Every structure is written in structure tokens, then in C-alpha cells.
């Protein structure tokens, strides 16, 4: 019965997305909701200008419909259900506002950094309050041990760092056709298996709803992309995967399951630090690091496949660590 629920959750999200995206693309084109390409980006990306964006509206809707339907059918509605709903829906809403400013007001950077950060912090605080009021453990596991450390009120700082950090990390990674879509299929599949193994069906249902939606979206987002997810999708996915890692108490494994997100973010931080420290020198040709490989002559598809492969290895190792 449990496996049936997971397969059904996956299938419904996948089908709704596959049907919805082709219907949504002409609507976005009619409204002229096309992606603007930043001037400092790689020149080979200029051809992507005008590609419909905000496609995440479809797959987030599909995910939420499937997730809520099968959560209620299976009787697995819990506090974790609503925490995951908060992460996906509210981070998605923040991303939608950012995308709307970009495409309607033609401001390629969307919300200011301060506005986006304050929004992320507000959502993270709400997540913590619901988490705390429902009596979830405010502890962190020490990797490769059975020891848990009670953080007390410091746990709220961890929540802020984790949710804000990973929502931004996925957002930074979303720069190549299909990259984040494919990595999300891999990462959420891994957490879905872990949640199922730990008998957390509420979380597992959520994970496989996302896998279904993302696999359906990938059909249209792979190179050459017919549609982009926008910040609507990347912020929602980043916030959600951070929330899942907390709910299954495998926070540190997210660093391995989401290793590409970590590497992409680290490349930006290193580049900025080195640039300022050396008065203008660079470590990489361009960051996030996927652009470094592009400018080194790699095709976009080669970069994506390589990064998917690294993400898959990290996910497999993580699942094995938990199960074996």
C-alpha cells in the first residue's frame, strides 16, 4: 500500500506537469513573460533571451495537488505535511514575486538582495515556529555516529542558515538548461528513499510528488529549453530540500546529496573573496562554476551531464550510509 501511494503520488504530479507545461508555454509567450539574460553572463546564453520563464507555477501546482491528495488518502497528514507545504509554497511565492518584477517591470535582477533575504528569513522563522510548537527535536546528528546534540535556541539560527542558504544555493545553480531539474530528480529521490526507509511516509510522499513534477518539467527544460522554472522554482526547491533534511534528521547528508549546490555556491564565495583580496584577480573564468566550464569549451549539455553524474554519486552514497 505504501509503495502504491508513492508511485501514485509520482504519477499524478508527472502527468499534471506534462499536460500543463505545453498549455502554459503559449500563455507565457502571449504575456511576453520571457527570460532576460544578464549582460555579464556568457555570450552564448544570449540566444536564450525571451525563453518563457516562471514555468515552476505548473510543477509546483502539480506537486501540491498530488502531495495533498495522497497525504489525505493515506492518512499521513501531520505537522511535517504543513511544514513541507510552507517551504514549497512560500519560497515559491517569494520566487514568483521576484520573477514577476523581472518579466513585467523588466528588471533582470528582480527583488533587491535585501528584499529577497528578508523574505527568506521571514519564511524560515515561520518554519521554525511551526516546527518548535509541534515539539520536533531541535537536535543535530554528529555525522557517522548515533550522537545527537541539543542546540536549544541556537536551532533557530541553524534553521535560518540552512533554509536561506540552500534556497540561494539552488537559485545560483539554476543557470543551465535542465541542470537544477535533473539534480532535483536525483536529490529528492534520495531523500524519498531515506524517508521511506525511516517510515516517514508523509515526507516520502512529498519527495516523490516533487520527483514526478520535476521529471515532467525536465522534458521541456532540457537543452535546448522550451521553458525555464525561474526563481519561482529554484527558491521553492532549495527551501524544500533543506526542510526535508531537517525533518528526516539527516541534515549533514544534504551536503553530499546536494553536493553540486554546495560546489556552485562555494565557487561564487571563493571568487568574490579572491577578487577582493587580490585587487581584481579571479580563480575561475566565471562563476557559478558551471560557467567556468562553459567558457573552457565544454558544451552546455556536457556540463549538465557531468554535474548530474556527480550529484547521482553523492545521492547513492548518502542512501547507502543511511540504509547500510
UniProtKB/Swiss-Prot annotation:
Its cofactor is Mg(2+). Keywords: Cell cycle, Cell division, Cell membrane, Cell shape, Cell wall biogenesis/degradation, Magnesium, Membrane, Metal-binding, Peptidoglycan synthesis, Transferase, Transmembrane, Transmembrane helix. Pathway: Cell wall biogenesis; peptidoglycan biosynthesis. This is Phospho-N-acetylmuramoyl-pentapeptide-transferase. It comes from Listeria monocytogenes serotype 4b (strain CLIP80459). It catalyses: UDP-N-acetyl-alpha-D-muramoyl-L-alanyl-gamma-D-glutamyl-meso-2,6-diaminopimeloyl-D-alanyl-D-alanine + di-trans,octa-cis-undecaprenyl phosphate = di-trans,octa-cis-undecaprenyl diphospho-N-acetyl-alpha-D-muramoyl-L-alanyl-D-glutamyl-meso-2,6-diaminopimeloyl-D-alanyl-D-alanine + UMP. Its main location: membrane. PANTHER family: PHOSPHO-N-ACETYLMURAMOYL-PENTAPEPTIDE-TRANSFERASE, PHOSPHO-N-ACETYLMURAMOYL-PENTAPEPTIDE-TRANSFERASE HOMOLOG. InterPro entries: Glycosyl_transferase_4, PNAcMuramoyl-5peptid_Trfase, PNAcMuramoyl-5peptid_Trfase_CS.
Amino acid at each position: 500500500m505504501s509503495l502504491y501511494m508513492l508511485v501514485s503520488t509520482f504519477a499524478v504530479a508527472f502527468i499534471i506537469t506534462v499536460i500543463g507545461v505545453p498549455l502554459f508555454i503559449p500563455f507565457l509567450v502571449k504575456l511576453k513573460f520571457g527570460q532576460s539574460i544578464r549582460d555579464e553572463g556568457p555570450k552564448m546564453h544570449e540566444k536564450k533571451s525571451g525563453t518563457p520563464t516562471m514555468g515552476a507555477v505548473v510543477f509546483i501546482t502539480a506537486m501540491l495537488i498530488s502531495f495533498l491528495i495522497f497525504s489525505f488518502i493515506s492518512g499521513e497528514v501531520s505537522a511535517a505535511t504543513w511544514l513541507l507545504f510552507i517551504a514549497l509554497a512560500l519560497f515559491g511565492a517569494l520566487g514568483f514575486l521576484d520573477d514577476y518584477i523581472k518579466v513585467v517591470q523588466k528588471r533582470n535582477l528582480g527583488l533587491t538582495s535585501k528584499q529577497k533575504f528578508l523574505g527568506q528569513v521571514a519564511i524560515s522563522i515561520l518554519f521554525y515556529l511551526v516546527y518548535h510548537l509541534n515539539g520536533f527535536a531541535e537536535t543535530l546528528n554528529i555525522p557517522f555516529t548515533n550522537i545527537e546534540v541539543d542546540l536549544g535556541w541556537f536551532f533557530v539560527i541553524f534553521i535560518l542558515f540552512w533554509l536561506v542558504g540552500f534556497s540561494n544555493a539552488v537559485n545560483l545553480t539554476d543557470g543551465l538548461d535542465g541542470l537544477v531539474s535533473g539534480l532535483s530528480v536525483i536529490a529528492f529521490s534520495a531523500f524519498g528513499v531515506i524517508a521511506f526507509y525511516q517510515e516517514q511516509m508523509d515526507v516520502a510522499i512529498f519527495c516523490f510528488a516533487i520527483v514526478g513534477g520535476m521529471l515532467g518539467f525536465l522534458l521541456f527544460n532540457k537543452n535546448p529549453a522550451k521553458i525555464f522554472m525561474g526563481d519561482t522554482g529554484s527558491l521553492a526547491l532549495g527551501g524544500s530540500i533543506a526542510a526535508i533534511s531537517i525533518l528526516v534528521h539527516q541534515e549533514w547528508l544534504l551536503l553530499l546529496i546536494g553536493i553540486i549546490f554546495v560546489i556552485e555556491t562555494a565557487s561564487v564565495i571563493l571568487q568574490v573573496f579572491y577578487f577582493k583580496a587580490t585587487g581584481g584577480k579571479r580563480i575561475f573564468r566565471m562563476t557559478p562554476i558551471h560557467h567556468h566550464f562553459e567558457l573552457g569549451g565544454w558544451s552546455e549539455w556536457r556540463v549538465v551531464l557531468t554535474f548530474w553524474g556527480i550529484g547521482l554519486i553523492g545521492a547513492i552514497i548518502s542512501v547507502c550510509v543511511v540504509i547500510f
